[in-house]
């Protein structure tokens, strides 16, 4: 019987995917506490499952901040369990910890996903507090790692949201000749979902993305465009957004810009020009 671990990380609160009101009120601590260093029951349970675990799924944003996780993984190596264990390791590429990389490299196989959702100043905007220069330096280290440890595949995973949808062709084409590149969707909160965009804006996005010369990108983007055209859940929309989802997009983006001294308009001028008629 295959055991499935899922270990979630901390340090995702400052991205644009964090809920705005949670960010303001700092109400995301409960989820973090479940895998905090002090939650002995959690870590003891993982230790008990360790001898039987065959697949361990470690989600980002940045799991290298969960230091006790690597104590567990080192224990697996010391006990010999690692020889039969496959890991999936999702990182936002903001930290390179050589000690932890050395631990991961000893497992039977590790699938690395580098979660990078924008280029240059777009990245800095979406992942507030992190910088493109640091991510690029770490990305290059992961590329070197992939060339050394062929049994451990390294891929780039682009999470598609309303902040980067207009530019995903450019992001994909930047990475596709360096590492395998694929997409993931930002489903929640609803006001970062590409489903929330106005219909006319969706059409402009479609027209731009379908001009790509990359056959692989065109295959990958087809289900994204289909997803974008789906309707938002009426039940979720009415409950969480009594004034509508799009007004919340404008409100949360504008207020976070003021708080963080950022500018959606200046960072994404081409996209904002399309959105501006609806930005009120």
What are these regions (language model features)?
Residues 42-43, 69-77, 135-144:
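Short, well-ordered amphipathic alpha-helices
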């Amino acid at each position: 019987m295959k055991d499935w671990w899922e270990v979630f990380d901390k340090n995702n609160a400052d991205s644009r995917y964090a809920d705005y009101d949670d960010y303001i009120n700092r109400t995301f601590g409960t989820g973090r506490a479940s895998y905090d260093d002090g939650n002995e029951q959690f870590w003891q349970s993982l230790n008990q499952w360790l001898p039987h675990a065959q697949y361990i799924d470690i989600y980002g944003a940045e799991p290298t901040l969960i230091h006790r996780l690597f104590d567990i993984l080192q224990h697996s190596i010391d006990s010999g369990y690692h020889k039969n264990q496959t890991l999936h390791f999702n990182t936002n590429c903001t930290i390179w910890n050589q000690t932890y990389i050395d631990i991961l490299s000893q497992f039977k196989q590790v699938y690395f996903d580098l979660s990078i959702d924008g280029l240059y100043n777009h990245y800095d905007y979406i992942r507030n507090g992190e910088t493109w220069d640091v991510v690029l330096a770490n990305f290059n280290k992961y590329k070197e790692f992939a060339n050394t440890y062929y049994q451990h595949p390294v891929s780039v995973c682009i999470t598609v949201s309303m902040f980067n949808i207009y530019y995903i062709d450019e992001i994909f084409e930047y990475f596709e000749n360096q590492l395998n590149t694929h997409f993931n969707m930002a489903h929640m909160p609803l006001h970062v979902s590409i489903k929330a965009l106005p219909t006319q804006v969706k059409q402009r996005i479609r027209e731009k993305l379908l001009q790509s010369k990359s056959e692989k990108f065109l295959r990958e983007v087809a289900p994204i465009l289909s997803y974008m055209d789906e309707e938002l859940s009426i039940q979720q929309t009415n409950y969480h957004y009594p004034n509508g989802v799009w007004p919340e997009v404008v409100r949360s983006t504008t207020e976070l810009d003021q708080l963080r001294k950022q500018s959606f308009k200046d960072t994404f001028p081409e996209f904002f020009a399309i959105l501006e008629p609806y930005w009120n």
